[in-house]
């Protein structure tokens, strides 16, 4: 996007999702302190039948709201879904819990999150809040799916 036509108050959904996906992919390579090594991290959600490599992570943007402050300042709140897929013939619940713990650690360690907006300018988020962590509790064994719902304030 041409910087001369950039808006002062624009959404940064795509940039934030991309930065989260990049951090997860770079961090979750099996080296300490992380226990998971992911095969793929994508900056979009896919249908279940499209997942072929495990463990896999997909990051997608959801609802975005605004909070208006004085002097024309506004905060944006972006809800992010981090969906995790595992395949384990021994203990799928443990494999999924380890991956979800690693995802949570990456999100917390990168708060505030630095990202590049559509004009190429470096930006930072104000706050990352993990709202919920949910799993299928082994119903799909040997496959497992879990979600971390995050709110990004920027």
Q: Where are each of the predicted segments found?
A:
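Charged, amphipathic alpha-helical segments and their flanking helix caps
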Residues: 1-49, 54-154
């Amino acid at each position: 996007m041409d910087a001369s036509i950039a808006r002062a108050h624009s959404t940064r959904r795509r940039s934030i999702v991309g930065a989260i996906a990049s951090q997860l992919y770079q961090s979750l390579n099996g080296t300490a302190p992380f226990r998971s090594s992911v095969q793929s991290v994508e900056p979009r959600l896919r249908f279940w039948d499209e997942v072929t490599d495990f463990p896999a992570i997909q990051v997608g943007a959801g609802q975005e709201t605004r909070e208006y402050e004085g002097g024309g300042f506004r905060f944006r709140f972006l809800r992010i879904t981090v969906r995790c897929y595992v395949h384990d013939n021994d203990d799928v619940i443990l494999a999924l819990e380890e991956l979800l713990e690693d995802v949570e650690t990456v999100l917390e360690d990168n708060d505030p999150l630095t990202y590049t907006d559509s004009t190429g300018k470096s930006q930072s988020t104000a706050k990352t809040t993990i709202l919920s962590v949910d799993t299928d509790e082994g119903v799909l064994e040997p496959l497992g799916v879990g979600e971390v719902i995050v709110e990004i304030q920027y």
